[in-house]
UniProtKB/Swiss-Prot annotation:
CXXCXGXG motif repeat windows: 147-154, 164-171, 186-193, 200-207
UniProt-listed Pfam families: DnaJ (PF00226), DnaJ_C (PF01556), DnaJ_CXXCXGXG (PF00684)
Cofactor note: Binds 2 Zn(2+) ions per monomer.
GO CC aspect terms: cytoplasm
Single biological process term from Gene Ontology: chaperone cofactor-dependent protein refolding
NCBIfam families the UniProt entry points to: DnaJ_bact, PRK10767.1
Disulphide-bridged cysteine pairs: none
Protein name per its UniProtKB record: Chaperone protein DnaJ
Subcellular location(s) per record: Cytoplasm
GO molecular function, one term: unfolded protein binding
Domain description: The J domain is necessary and sufficient to stimulate DnaK ATPase activity. Zinc center 1 plays an important role in the autonomous, DnaK-independent chaperone activity of DnaJ. Zinc center 2 is essential for interaction with DnaK and for DnaJ activity.
Length: 377
């Protein structure tokens, strides 16, 4: 099968400069690197092709030969006598590969490896009233803190801390296997990048210790379930003096016994008596600011909703206030006396045939009549 064009493999134009070729190689090598693809044979073959293409196109002489003769320039007896594959083995002839993988994976430097601390999560439950008004809560978190005995060095006082001779402070080691370059945690220093003569007794050389931290968290007014508050630098301590991670406080608002929340609006069910619904009047309803008056028109039915503007929740960022929506439930009287029953019977009799006074009932009965009339046809 004919070999694919090297320029096509890297996805660059034939006139691409060295910078564009290097950039394309870095992107593809990172994508198909064996450490990322975990044994995927197709990706391994792709990685070989990418390395082969870059080995040729990154070298001016080899690229010139390829541009003139194509793949034939590197066949048996061709350019450099590298054999049918065009390579002599290993990465020995790959100019620039060492530098690129150093950039991609942080190798080649004798600097001690620094790793930012982990981000932490804390779930907190608050009441609706606390969510509406805002509150400061004291919390305790389990975290990794800088060891106060060795100040994070991991070494006992007076003990030497040297750069790991195996990984030269990188914390990881690279191995070349044909076209592949793999990187693993240094087996000598276990990724710390350093060699400690006498490890700290308290943290055992890690430089960090498990600790319970107490914090005050200011929760702003208007938060809702699922909102996250980020406390920068309040996560786990970093390794070797690296910055600490962040703490994310996740809000959970408890269900309320009166109100239901939908965004910045509040909903509540308001029961009224049979006579209040029929005659109308003014009732008291609960709001987050206390009691408020609500006017009930004559003839109010169950399910009617009244909107009280601005009586909802004030948004955290915009300052816009939602509404309170009151849903009316008309209560049917129970355990009536004989006298009360007699009065209701008289009322029922007086309403007989008065369609304007019982609009829903009349409409329903008309609909039922039409339904049965149609069945009989």
């Amino acid at each position: 099968m004919a070999k694919q064009d090297y320029y096509e493999i890297l996805g660059v134009e034939r006139g691409a400069d060295e910078k564009a070729i290097k950039k394309a190689y870095k992107r593809l090598a990172m994508k198909y690197h064996p450490d990322r693809t975990k044994g995927d044979k197709t990706s391994e073959e792709k990685f070989k092709e990418i390395n082969e293409a870059y080995e040729i196109l990154s070298d001016k002489e080899k690229r010139a030969a390829y541009d003139q003769y194509g793949h034939a320039a590197f066949e048996q007896g061709g350019f450099g006598g590298a054999g049918a594959g065009g390579f002599g083995g290993g990465f020995g002839g790959f100019g620039g590969f060492e530098d690129i993988f150093s950039e991609m994976f942080g190798g080649g430097s004798s600097r001690q490896r620094v790793v930012r601390g982990d981000d932490l999560r804390y779930d907190i439950e608050i009441t609706l009233e606390e969510a509406v008004r805002g509150i400061t809560k004291d919390i305790q978190i389990q975290t990794l803190a800088t060891c106060d005995h060795c100040n994070g060095s991991g070494a006992e006082k007076g003990s030497k801390v040297e750069t790991c001779p195996t990984c030269h402070g990188h914390g990881r080691v690279r191995r070349q296997q044909g076209f592949f370059m793999t990187e693993t945690t240094c087996p000598h220093c276990h990724g710390t990048g350093k060699k400690i003569e006498k490890p700290c007794k308290k943290c055992h050389g890690d430089g960090r210790v498990h600790k319970t931290e107490s914090l005050s968290v200011k929760i702003p007014a208007g938060v809702d379930t699922g909102n996250q508050l980020r406390l920068a630098g309040k996560g786990a301590a970093g390794e070797n003096g690296a910055p600490a991670g962040d703490l994310y406080v996740v809000i959970h608002v408890k269900e309320h016994h009166i109100f239901e929340r939908d965004g910045n609006n509040l909903y509540c069910e308001v029961p009224i008596s049979f006579t209040q619904a029929a005659l109308g009047g003014e009732i008291e309803v609960p709001t987050l600011d206390g009691r408020a008056k609500l006017k009930i028109p004559e003839g109010t039915q169950t399910g009617t909703m009244f909107r009280m503007r601005g009586k909802g929740i004030t948004a955290m960022r915009s300052g816009y206030s939602g509404d309170l929506i009151c849903k009316i439930t008309v209560e049917t009287p129970v355990k009536l006396t004989d006298e009360q029953k007699d009065l209701l019977h008289k009322l029922e009799a007086s309403l007989e045939g008065k369609t304007t006074q019982r609009p829903k009932s009349s409409s329903f009965l008309d609909g039922v009549k039409k339904f049965f009339d149609n069945l009989g046809k």
